[in-house]
Amino acid sequence: MTDTEHRLEVVEAKEAVRDCLARYLDLCDVPGPLQSPDQLGVLFTDDATWEGLGPEYAGKFGIARGRDEIVALVSRYLPPADHFLRNVHLLGSEQIRLDGNRASGQWIMQQLSLYATGTAEILCARLTIDFDLGRTGGRTAARMSRFCTRRMFAAPLPAEAMFQRI
């Protein structure tokens, strides 16, 4: 493999990781494009884990093992469940490392939420995620094999601000 081919492989692998995580967060936004829980499931390996870490998230989320448990856990917070009225995710501070057909990454996620209860908050969490890399249709594809989230910051927001129109 030439240096150029290797560099292209690295770029494609990192882009596949970004695409997978961005799709997951897009599906978790409310309102969002989620039509079926299966859309979430295909983003994870069969034996994936999804885990809440730290004092705020370990008890709230615990650990889900396997694709079906992960989809069930995440679906509890998405329509048609009456949890969020609005919810949006933003990512930053990206770090992606590649090791053969595996990748790992860390991000800071900002989440703005308006709950069905009428309360609103902003929070930041550290996401630490492992991915399996493969080829699908001639392209590099990533699926999450381990997803960990740890809350770093949270503060209430005035709910009326979430209803403002631009």
What are these regions (language model features)?
Residues 3-7, 23, 53-57, 79, ...:
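A near-ubiquitous, low-amplitude feature marking generic local secondary-structure context
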Residues 1-30, 34-43:
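Short, low-complexity N-terminal intrinsically disordered segments enriched in polar/charged residues
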Residues 2-5, 83-166:
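A beta-strand edge to alpha-helix "cap/lid" segment located at domain peripheries
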Residues 9-16, 62, 84, 119:
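Conserved aromatic-histidine-acidic binding/catalytic patches
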Residues 34-109:
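A solvent-exposed, acidic/Ser-Thr-rich amphipathic alpha-helical stretch
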Residues 25-33, 49-55, 113, 136:
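Short regulatory "switch" loops immediately downstream of catalytic or recognition motifs
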